[in-house]
């Protein structure tokens, strides 16, 4: 992370010494139990999607907390792992909106400029939201603020009440906010189905002179 295009700009948004606190937190929790994702993948979203490449931000809450699922990209799992219910619903909406994506590993999206960011970057095994409110939110809010300050128009995709609270950080009128219910089975019928976020994002990117995302990769 230290050598990425993100580092200095995120650091400037945070109190002095905050990166050190993050490092201490990670050393502590990874030494005490099973934490997801693997330590080397905690910052995967920022390492895969460089700041100068960001076109779309899809905000999640925290990583999957089952074995082998979390890979540092919101909603994504390796193809060797069955797609969790929310991801199944995302891919179904994509199928209805644009077409069928055969892989449920979303790395190809990240490589095209889709920042797959969780608000909380770590989770204890089996404990959803187990690290919520401890260290990560100021850091990931800073990431959102860095993207907000870009002159280049960006699409922010906010699914569910938690993500939609982050709308307050997106103040730049150049950007597009697409919001709906969360793809979780509990809320998918409250406005996620039929919301067509993928085609809406691509329409905006084309209108602003940018290459659309190949969502089927």
UniProtKB/Swiss-Prot annotation:
EC category name: hydrolase
Active-site residues (renumbered): 62
Catalytic activity: Hydrolyzes single-stranded DNA or mismatched double-stranded DNA and polynucleotides, releasing free uracil
Enzyme Commission number, as recorded: 3.2.2.27
Main localization (coarse): cytoplasm
Location of this chain's protein in the cell: Cytoplasm
Function per UniProt: Excises uracil residues from the DNA which can arise as a result of misincorporation of dUMP residues by DNA polymerase or due to deamination of cytosine.
Name of the protein this chain belongs to: Uracil-DNA glycosylase
Organism, as annotated: Streptococcus pneumoniae serotype 2 (strain D39 / NCTC 7466)
Lineage: Bacteria, Bacillati, Bacillota, Bacilli, Lactobacillales
Primary gene name: ung
